[in-house]
Structures are given as structure tokens and as C-alpha cells.
UniProtKB/Swiss-Prot annotation:
Function: Involved in disulfide-bond formation. Acts by transferring its disulfide bond to other proteins.
Database matches in CDD domains: DsbA_DsbA
Location relative to the cell: Periplasm
Signal is among the record's keywords: yes
Protein name: Thiol:disulfide interchange protein DsbA
Keyword Cell division applies: no
PROSITE patterns: THIOREDOXIN_1, THIOREDOXIN_2
UniProt similarity note: Belongs to the thioredoxin family. DsbA subfamily.
Stored PANTHER family: THIOL:DISULFIDE INTERCHANGE PROTEIN DSBA (PTHR35891:SF2)
Any single Gene Ontology cellular-component annotation: periplasmic space
Keywords: Disulfide bond, Periplasm, Redox-active center, Signal
Ranges for domain Thioredoxin: 18-208
Length: 214
């Protein structure tokens, strides 16, 4: 299993294949240990008082890219008591490089502006975005100042956020992406849920469970 996980990471692919969308889930179908698991140690959320949903992802992951339209539409309709955030998975190599790209753009407050464009650049246009200079050149085409980006990319703040992301992935016990975690308690993925839409149904179910428990 360890070799399988390592192979998937080195290949830049997810362990959780999208496959064919399984039959739509009803709330009665969703069971702990089947569609989702409870983490043995609950992880503190970033915004206490809100129900937190985290997606762990990698820009280079094809399954994350295919999941994007569904999760973007879903996240855009979340109620006020739910917070959604993305966290890059950092497994070394390009994972870390792209994770640093994401965290830099997030620190600059411009990540939503270019999130989809970065996915498209990698998966449609074949760009690697493997160096800060290549990233800066690409981002300049989207109105982001090169020098400001390069300064932020190497900043202490971004490096600190990298360490936090690494620790979070360990706490969540993830081995591939995309993965979702609700309220620091429940982890699930495309494979366990049975496809993209079912994954979001599991998220909705767990959000409602957490809301009812408040």
C-alpha cells in the first residue's frame, strides 16, 4: 500500500479516481465508515463559530481539475454559517511548488482571480509552472505584478503557511487528493463517496449534521 501511495504521489495522480458517477445518494444511504470516516483526533477549525469545509488539492492533479466545476458551483451557494477554503497538499516536488504558488496568491488576495486559469494552464495548455519566474510571467498576463508576486513567493509569511498546510495534511491523515474535510472531524473523497456529485452530497449531509449538533 505504501508503494501504491508513493507511486501515485510521484506520478502526480490521485488515488481516488473519478470513475463513473455512482447512483445518487440519499441521506439514508450515507454511512460513517462507508462514504466518510471520522478522524481519530478532531482538528481545530480556522473560523470558530462556522461550519468549516476544507478541500485539499493540487493544481497538477487531473481529478482535482475535473472536480473544479462541481465544487466551484457548490461553494458559491453555501449559506453564511459555512466557510469553505482550499488547502494545498504538499507531498514534495511540484506539489510543494504549486502549493507555494497557491499560498502566495492567497496571501496577495488575488487567488480567486486566477485559480481556474492556473488549472487550465497546466491541464489544457501543458504549462508546468515549475519555477517562480515562469509563474510570474504567466500571472503577469492576468494583471498580477511580477515583482510583487516574486517578493511574496519568497516571504516568511508564505513559508509559514506552507508549514501549516503540511501539518494540516498530517492531522487529516491524507494520502492523495482531492479530499474534503468537514469541521475538522469527517474526511471523505471521490472514491469513498462515489463520484463528484455524491461527494458534495456527503458534504451537505455532514454540514447539516454539524448544524443540528450546535
Amino acid at each position: 500500500m505504501r508503494k501504491l501511495i508513493l507511486g501515485a504521489i510521484l506520478a502526480g495522480t490521485s488515488l481516488f479516481a473519478l470513475g463513473t458517477q455512482a447512483e445518487s445518494l440519499s441521506p439514508a444511504d450515507i454511512k460513517i465508515g462507508r462514504q466518510y470516516v471520522e478522524l481519530p483526533t478532531h482538528v481545530p477549525v480556522a473560523q470558530p463559530g462556522k461550519i468549516e469545509v476544507v478541500e485539499l488539492f493540487w493544481y497538477g492533479c487531473p481529478h482535482c481539475y475535473q472536480f473544479e466545476p462541481s465544487i466551484n458551483a457548490w461553494a458559491g451557494k453555501l449559506p453564511e454559517d459555512v466557510s469553505f477554503r482550499r488547502v494545498p497538499a504538499l507531498f514534495g516536488g511540484l506539489w510543494n511548488i504549486h502549493g507555494q504558488l497557491f499560498l502566495t496568491l492567497e496571501a496577495m488576495g488575488v487567488e480567486p482571480k486566477v485559480h481556474t486559469a492556473i488549472f487550465d494552464a497546466i491541464h489544457k495548455d501543458g504549462k508546468k509552472l515549475a519555477t517562480p519566474e515562469e509563474m510570474a510571467e504567466f500571472l503577469a498576463g492576468h494583471g498580477i505584478d511580477k515583482d510583487a508576486f516574486l517578493k511574496a513567493y519568497g516571504s516568511f509569511n508564505v513559508k509559514s503557511q506552507m508549514e501549516k498546510a503540511k501539518k494540516l495534511a498530517i492531522a487529516y491523515q491524507i494520502s492523495g487528493v482531492p479530499v474534503m474535510v468537514v469541521n475538522g472531524k469527517y474526511r471523505f473523497d471521490l472514491g469513498s463517496a462515489g463520484g463528484p456529485e455524491n461527494t458534495l452530497q456527503v458534504a451537505d449531509y455532514l454540514i447539516e449534521q454539524e448544524r443540528s449538533a450546535q
